[in-house]
Amino acid sequence: MGLHPCSPVDHGVPSWVLVLLLTLGLCSLQATADSVLDPDFRENYFEQYMDHFNFESFSNKTFGQRFLVSDKFWKMGEGPIFFYTGNEGDIWSLANNSGFIVELAAQQEALLVFAEHRYYGKSLPFGVQSTQRGYTQLLTVEQALADFAVLLQALRHNLGVQDAPTIAFGGSYGGMLSAYMRMKYPHLVAGALAASAPVIAVAGLGNPDQFFRDVTADFYGQSPKCAQAVRDAFQQIKDLFLQGAYDTISQNFGTCQSLSSPKDLTQLFGFARNAFTVLAMMDYPYPTNFLGPLPANPVKVGCERLLSEGQRIMGLRALAGLVYNSSGMEPCFDIYQMYQSCADPTGCGTGSNARAWDYQACTEINLTFDSNNVTDMFPEIPFSDELRQQYCLDTWGVWPRPDWLQTSFWGGDLKAASNIIFSNGDLDPWAGGGIQRNLSTSIIAVTIQGGAHHLDLRASNSEDPPSVVEVRKLEATLIREWVAAARLKQPAEAQWPGPK
């Protein structure tokens, strides 16, 4: 196993490792002197097995798994390893939105590693074909976890720190993976911070109405009038459609194409509903650019836009523009290009990463969420197990296994695990699908008041609610304790006492 583009030198140590070792002395001094916490990540590729669990089909074939590494704050031989378990996206985007981990590395003198998930970003087992039908068979949670485990072992071996305590970090699906790493590979990972990790929902154990009910609650909490206006806008669109006033809908909402079929209406409803999902998840108290550029407090801004228009459908258009037309340069909404329906009703996005996530939502990740216009403010859009199964057969030729995560990763019964923090924000619609109470003295659940999707993983900001400041302090304390405990558990070197 090696790394690209660097090649091993004569003694078998990859050249990137030599660079890392040569710079350690300087970096250890800078860790306390630098006032700006830029981790100076370096991008590398690791030769990863394509298939960890089959010795025949792919033999020893490998692909390049991308990872980012920073030793800027690391005290070699004493500092831990902070290992981010990448999720459904480009690893640079995830690293750039996880500043708390960098801050914590500076405090605790840790080596930083951000590992990209197979089939996402540039970690493509079959190149550009990877997310096409017929090439996705190696995209599983288990394969991704094995990637992380093999990479971590190789890093520790190459750096000569086989006993360095490692803490896994992740947010959302990545938070699930960080918890799973602690559960499946406890000899490698001493603890995990699983931020906004919906481990219950994805195992098929949640309420299918919960997600969009909680999105609605965010907007109702901002303004009951806003939530009612959303209901009114969707009802007006439906009424106009039933009257055959397709051009009126297109003109008022601003679609590039006129609606002409029930399929178009469902697509429009999904397109608009997705905008609310994004705003609720990204409801941070300062401007961000994670899923796209958004202003501070986007739920509040969205409601203001909606209510500022006298015509409700035009108000809905103004709100959707926060997500789909942040530049203000789009003349209209291409509802089929900007939003693609998939096996995740909360949205897959577009492009290669979206196709990979759609496949995962068709196999192991169970996301059968409905909106019903009773417990939520959205049009009735069902997504049952039966509808999911048919979609996945048609799209990928696969049968979902709705109960598999309960079997493989315990569902919500995690009492036998240890050293995992499950953090959730009370504004995050994913929180209801996660662990929200302590399961033991070391399976800890914390709630961030005024917190959106994995707010605690983001860099400190002067606009942060007081709750997230306190939660980060708790997380830092627990992680420091886990690292110290892992050090104490390391076996002492055997001493040969000599002949009696």
Curated annotation (Swiss-Prot):
EC number per UniProt:
3.4.14.2
Q: What are its GO cellular component terms?
A: cytoplasmic vesicle; extracellular region; lysosome; vesicle
| Keyword Secreted assigned | yes
First-listed, main subcellular location of the protein, grouped into a coarse class:
other
Going by the UniProt annotation, this protein carries glycans at 60, 96, 325, 366, 373, 438
Molecular function terms, GO-annotated:
aminopeptidase activity; dipeptidyl-peptidase activity; serine-type exopeptidase activity
Supply the InterPro entries for this chain. Answer: AB_hydrolase_fold, Peptidase_S28, Ser_carbopepase_S28_SKS
Record field: catalytic activity: Release of an N-terminal dipeptide, Xaa-Yaa-|-, preferentially when Yaa is Ala or Pro. Substrates are oligopeptides, preferentially tripeptides
Residue ranges annotated as propeptide are 34-36
The question of whether Manganese is a record keyword is answered with: no
Q: SUPFAM superfamilies this protein is in?
A: alpha/beta-Hydrolases
Q: Which residues, if any, are the signal sequence?
A: 1-33
The compartments listed are: Lysosome; Cytoplasmic vesicle; Secreted
Q: Which residues form the active site?
A: 172 (charge relay system), 428 (charge relay system), 453 (charge relay system)
User: Per its UniProt record, what Gene3D superfamilies does this chain match?
Assistant: alpha/beta hydrolase, Serine carboxypeptidase S28, SKS domain
- What keywords does the record list, in alphabetical order? Aminopeptidase, Cytoplasmic vesicle, Glycoprotein, Hydrolase, Lysosome, Protease, Secreted, Serine protease, Signal, Zymogen
The biological process GO terms on file are: lysosomal protein catabolic process; protein catabolic process; proteolysis
Tissue expression profile of the protein: Predominantly expressed in kidney, but also expressed in a variety of tissues.
The similarity annotation says: Belongs to the peptidase S28 family.
Quaternary context: Homodimer.
Q: What does this protein do?
A: Plays an important role in the degradation of some oligopeptides.
Protein name as annotated: Dipeptidyl peptidase 2
From the broadest rank down, the organism's phylogenetic lineage runs: Eukaryota, Metazoa, Chordata, Craniata, Vertebrata
